[in-house]
Protein backbone atom coordinates (compact mmCIF):
# COMPACT_ATOMS: atom_id res chain seq x y z
CA UNK A 1 0.00 0.00 0.00
CA UNK A 2 1.21 3.49 -0.71
CA UNK A 3 0.57 6.84 0.73
CA UNK A 4 0.95 9.80 -1.58
CA UNK A 5 1.00 13.07 0.16
CA UNK A 6 0.22 16.54 -0.91
CA UNK A 7 -1.52 18.12 1.96
CA UNK A 8 -4.75 19.78 1.14
CA UNK A 9 -4.40 23.39 2.05
CA UNK A 10 -1.41 22.54 4.00
CA UNK A 11 -0.06 18.75 1.30
CA UNK A 12 0.08 14.12 -0.97
CA UNK A 13 1.67 10.59 0.24
CA UNK A 14 1.70 6.80 -0.36
CA UNK A 15 1.14 3.73 1.95
CA UNK A 16 4.44 2.24 2.98
CA UNK A 17 6.44 5.25 1.76
CA UNK A 18 8.19 7.96 3.72
CA UNK A 19 7.18 11.63 3.98
CA UNK A 20 5.01 13.84 6.12
CA UNK A 21 1.79 15.08 5.54
CA UNK A 22 0.00 18.31 5.64
CA UNK A 23 0.80 18.42 2.03
CA UNK A 24 0.82 16.26 -1.04
CA UNK A 25 1.84 12.72 -0.34
CA UNK A 26 0.80 9.35 -1.54
CA UNK A 27 0.20 6.28 0.53
CA UNK A 28 2.23 3.60 -1.19
CA UNK A 29 3.14 -0.05 -1.55
CA UNK A 30 4.24 -1.39 1.81
CA UNK A 31 7.93 -1.34 2.49
CA UNK A 32 8.75 1.28 -0.16
CA UNK A 33 10.55 4.45 0.78
CA UNK A 34 9.10 7.49 -0.94
CA UNK A 35 10.62 10.70 -2.26
CA UNK A 36 8.39 13.65 -3.09
CA UNK A 37 6.54 15.71 -5.98
CA UNK A 38 4.02 16.51 -9.10
CA UNK A 39 3.48 19.70 -10.99
CA UNK A 40 1.14 22.59 -11.74
CA UNK A 41 1.64 25.26 -14.43
CA UNK A 42 0.11 28.54 -15.73
CA UNK A 43 -0.37 32.18 -14.78
CA UNK A 44 1.82 35.28 -14.60
CA UNK A 45 4.85 35.61 -12.36
CA UNK A 46 4.78 37.96 -9.37
CA UNK A 47 7.92 39.67 -8.11
CA UNK A 48 8.83 37.96 -4.82
CA UNK A 49 10.65 40.96 -3.36
CA UNK A 50 8.52 42.41 -0.60
CA UNK A 51 9.57 41.43 2.94
CA UNK A 52 7.58 38.86 4.89
CA UNK A 53 4.99 40.91 6.84
CA UNK A 54 4.50 38.66 9.86
CA UNK A 55 4.95 35.02 10.88
CA UNK A 56 1.26 34.06 10.90
CA UNK A 57 -0.38 31.98 8.17
CA UNK A 58 -4.02 31.81 7.22
CA UNK A 59 -4.55 28.36 5.71
CA UNK A 60 -5.95 28.58 2.17
CA UNK A 61 -9.18 26.81 1.28
CA UNK A 62 -8.24 23.08 1.39
CA UNK A 63 -10.71 22.35 -1.40
CA UNK A 64 -8.72 24.64 -3.70
CA UNK A 65 -5.04 24.12 -2.81
CA UNK A 66 -2.52 21.33 -2.15
CA UNK A 67 0.55 22.27 -0.13
CA UNK A 68 3.68 20.78 -1.67
CA UNK A 69 6.47 22.24 0.45
CA UNK A 70 7.97 24.94 2.64
CA UNK A 71 10.95 27.18 1.90
CA UNK A 72 13.34 26.65 4.80
CA UNK A 73 16.47 28.57 3.80
CA UNK A 74 18.49 30.22 1.05
CA UNK A 75 20.94 28.15 -1.01
CA UNK A 76 24.11 29.89 -2.19
CA UNK A 77 24.29 33.42 -3.57
CA UNK A 78 22.29 33.20 -6.81
CA UNK A 79 18.77 33.26 -5.36
CA UNK A 80 18.12 29.53 -5.02
CA UNK A 81 16.03 28.32 -2.07
CA UNK A 82 15.91 25.09 -0.10
CA UNK A 83 12.47 23.49 0.17
CA UNK A 84 11.29 20.82 2.60
CA UNK A 85 8.84 18.74 0.54
CA UNK A 86 5.30 17.92 1.56
CA UNK A 87 4.86 15.89 -1.62
CA UNK A 88 5.92 12.45 -2.80
CA UNK A 89 6.01 13.63 -6.43
CA UNK A 90 9.47 14.82 -7.58
CA UNK A 91 7.90 16.60 -10.56
CA UNK A 92 6.54 19.22 -8.19
CA UNK A 93 10.11 20.43 -7.65
CA UNK A 94 12.02 19.32 -10.74
CA UNK A 95 9.74 20.17 -13.68
CA UNK A 96 9.56 23.87 -14.66
CA UNK A 97 6.18 25.56 -14.56
CA UNK A 98 3.93 27.61 -12.35
CA UNK A 99 3.70 27.04 -8.62
CA UNK A 100 1.91 29.20 -6.04
CA UNK A 101 3.68 30.96 -3.18
CA UNK A 102 2.02 31.87 0.13
CA UNK A 103 3.77 34.37 2.38
CA UNK A 104 3.09 34.61 6.11
CA UNK A 105 0.29 37.09 6.66
CA UNK A 106 -1.32 36.47 3.28
CA UNK A 107 -4.47 34.46 2.64
CA UNK A 108 -4.13 33.51 -1.04
CA UNK A 109 -1.10 31.97 -2.75
CA UNK A 110 0.37 33.97 -5.65
CA UNK A 111 1.72 32.41 -8.86
CA UNK A 112 5.47 32.14 -9.29
CA UNK A 113 7.48 30.36 -11.95
CA UNK A 114 9.73 27.42 -11.12
CA UNK A 115 12.74 27.60 -13.45
CA UNK A 116 14.50 24.43 -12.31
CA UNK A 117 15.04 22.27 -9.25
CA UNK A 118 17.12 19.39 -7.94
CA UNK A 119 17.01 16.93 -5.06
CA UNK A 120 19.64 16.98 -2.30
CA UNK A 121 20.43 13.35 -1.52
CA UNK A 122 20.41 12.38 2.17
CA UNK A 123 18.88 15.72 3.19
CA UNK A 124 15.27 15.23 2.04
CA UNK A 125 15.36 18.74 0.57
CA UNK A 126 15.00 20.25 -2.88
CA UNK A 127 16.88 23.26 -4.21
CA UNK A 128 14.71 25.46 -6.44
CA UNK A 129 15.35 28.48 -8.65
CA UNK A 130 12.26 30.68 -8.79
CA UNK A 131 11.74 33.44 -11.35
CA UNK A 132 12.55 36.92 -10.07
CA UNK A 133 14.66 35.64 -7.17
CA UNK A 134 18.19 36.52 -8.22
CA UNK A 135 20.30 36.95 -5.09
CA UNK A 136 20.63 35.67 -1.54
CA UNK A 137 18.86 38.67 -0.04
CA UNK A 138 15.73 37.96 -2.09
CA UNK A 139 15.86 34.24 -1.33
CA UNK A 140 16.24 34.92 2.41
CA UNK A 141 13.02 36.95 2.27
CA UNK A 142 11.18 33.81 1.17
CA UNK A 143 12.19 31.78 4.22
CA UNK A 144 9.03 30.31 5.79
CA UNK A 145 6.88 30.75 2.68
CA UNK A 146 4.75 27.80 1.58
CA UNK A 147 4.43 26.38 -1.94
CA UNK A 148 1.11 25.15 -3.35
CA UNK A 149 -0.49 23.74 -6.47
CA UNK A 150 -4.22 23.87 -7.29
CA UNK A 151 -6.26 20.98 -5.92
CA UNK A 152 -7.44 20.40 -9.49
CA UNK A 153 -3.85 19.35 -10.26
CA UNK A 154 -4.13 16.46 -7.82
CA UNK A 155 -2.59 13.42 -9.54
CA UNK A 156 -4.27 10.09 -10.05
CA UNK A 157 -2.99 7.33 -7.82
CA UNK A 158 -2.38 3.66 -8.47
CA UNK A 159 -3.75 0.62 -6.68
CA UNK A 160 -3.28 0.75 -2.90
CA UNK A 161 -2.19 4.39 -3.07
CA UNK A 162 -3.90 7.06 -0.98
CA UNK A 163 -3.70 10.78 -0.47
CA UNK A 164 -2.84 11.55 3.14
CA UNK A 165 -5.60 14.14 3.29
CA UNK A 166 -8.11 11.36 2.52
CA UNK A 167 -6.81 9.21 5.37
CA UNK A 168 -7.15 11.91 8.03
CA UNK A 169 -10.39 11.44 9.95
CA UNK A 170 -11.02 7.85 8.81
CA UNK A 171 -12.28 5.54 11.54
CA UNK A 172 -10.17 2.52 12.47
CA UNK A 173 -11.74 -0.81 13.48
CA UNK A 174 -10.43 -4.17 14.61
CA UNK A 175 -11.09 -6.52 11.72
CA UNK A 176 -11.69 -9.56 13.92
CA UNK A 177 -14.29 -8.04 16.26
CA UNK A 178 -15.50 -4.93 14.46
CA UNK A 179 -14.73 -2.85 17.56
CA UNK A 180 -13.96 0.83 16.99
CA UNK A 181 -10.34 1.67 17.79
CA UNK A 182 -10.35 5.38 17.00
CA UNK A 183 -9.77 7.86 14.19
CA UNK A 184 -6.71 8.79 12.13
CA UNK A 185 -5.35 12.20 13.14
CA UNK A 186 -2.01 12.19 11.29
CA UNK A 187 0.30 10.17 9.06
CA UNK A 188 3.89 10.07 10.28
CA UNK A 189 6.79 9.30 7.95
CA UNK A 190 9.07 6.36 8.67
CA UNK A 191 10.52 3.39 6.78
CA UNK A 192 6.89 2.31 6.68
CA UNK A 193 4.48 5.15 7.39
CA UNK A 194 2.61 5.23 10.68
CA UNK A 195 -1.04 6.10 11.19
CA UNK A 196 -1.46 8.19 14.32
CA UNK A 197 -4.82 7.10 15.70
CA UNK A 198 -6.68 8.90 18.46
CA UNK A 199 -8.15 6.09 20.55
CA UNK A 200 -11.89 5.98 21.07
CA UNK A 201 -12.98 6.85 24.60
CA UNK A 202 -16.39 7.56 26.15
CA UNK A 203 -17.53 11.14 25.54
CA UNK A 204 -17.84 11.61 29.30
CA UNK A 205 -14.08 11.29 29.69
CA UNK A 206 -12.40 14.58 30.58
CA UNK A 207 -8.97 13.25 29.66
CA UNK A 208 -7.12 14.12 26.50
CA UNK A 209 -7.61 11.21 24.05
CA UNK A 210 -4.68 8.82 23.88
CA UNK A 211 -3.07 8.07 20.55
CA UNK A 212 -1.33 5.02 19.15
CA UNK A 213 0.94 4.62 16.13
CA UNK A 214 -0.10 1.87 13.70
CA UNK A 215 2.20 0.80 10.83
CA UNK A 216 0.43 1.56 7.57
CA UNK A 217 1.26 -1.68 5.79
CA UNK A 218 -1.00 -4.22 4.12
CA UNK A 219 -0.34 -6.89 6.74
CA UNK A 220 -1.64 -4.68 9.56
CA UNK A 221 -4.12 -2.47 7.67
CA UNK A 222 -5.54 -4.85 5.05
CA UNK A 223 -8.74 -2.86 4.45
CA UNK A 224 -8.78 0.84 3.55
CA UNK A 225 -12.24 1.84 2.30
CA UNK A 226 -12.37 5.49 1.27
CA UNK A 227 -16.08 5.37 0.45
CA UNK A 228 -17.13 4.26 3.92
CA UNK A 229 -14.21 6.12 5.58
CA UNK A 230 -13.21 2.88 7.31
CA UNK A 231 -9.84 1.23 7.96
CA UNK A 232 -9.70 -2.32 9.36
CA UNK A 233 -6.59 -3.44 11.19
CA UNK A 234 -5.11 -6.71 12.43
CA UNK A 235 -2.62 -5.41 15.02
CA UNK A 236 0.00 -7.67 16.58
CA UNK A 237 -0.40 -8.33 20.32
CA UNK A 238 0.42 -5.32 22.47
CA UNK A 239 0.38 -2.72 19.68
CA UNK A 240 -2.73 -0.90 20.90
CA UNK A 241 -1.39 -0.78 24.45
CA UNK A 242 1.46 1.46 23.29
CA UNK A 243 -0.66 4.61 23.28
CA UNK A 244 0.72 8.03 24.14
CA UNK A 245 -0.90 11.07 25.68
CA UNK A 246 -2.84 11.56 28.88
Curated annotation (Swiss-Prot):
GO terms for cellular component: cytoplasm; ribosome. Pfam families: PRC_RimM, RimM. Residues 1-15 have a biased composition (Basic and acidic residues). It is found in: Cytoplasm. Keywords: Chaperone, Cytoplasm, Ribosome biogenesis, rRNA processing. One of its GO terms (molecular function) is ribosome binding. Residues 158-239 form the PRC barrel domain. Residues 1-63 are annotated as: Disordered. It comes from the Bacteria. Residues 45-54 have a biased composition (Pro residues). InterPro entries: PRC_barrel-like_sf, PRC_RimM, RimM, RimM_N, RimM_N_sf, Transl_B-barrel_sf. GO terms for biological process: ribosomal small subunit biogenesis; rRNA processing. HAMAP family: Ribosome_mat_RimM. An accessory protein needed during the final step in the assembly of 30S ribosomal subunit, possibly for assembly of the head region. Essential for efficient processing of 16S rRNA. May be needed both before and after RbfA during the maturation of 16S rRNA. It has affinity for free ribosomal 30S subunits but not for 70S ribosomes. The PRC barrel domain binds ribosomal protein uS19. Belongs to the RimM family. Binds ribosomal protein uS19. NCBIfam families: 16S_RimM (TIGR02273). This is Ribosome maturation factor RimM. The lineage of its organism: Bacteria, Bacillati, Cyanobacteriota, Cyanophyceae, Nostocales. The gene is rimM.
Amino acid sequence: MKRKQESKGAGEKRQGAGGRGQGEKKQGKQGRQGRQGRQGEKSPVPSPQSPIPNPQFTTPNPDEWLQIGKIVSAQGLSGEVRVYPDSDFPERFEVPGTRWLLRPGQTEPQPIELLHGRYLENKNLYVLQLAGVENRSQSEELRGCMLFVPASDRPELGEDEYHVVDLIGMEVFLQASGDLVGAVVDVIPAGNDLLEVSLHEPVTSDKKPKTVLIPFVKAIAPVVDLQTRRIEITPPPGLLELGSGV
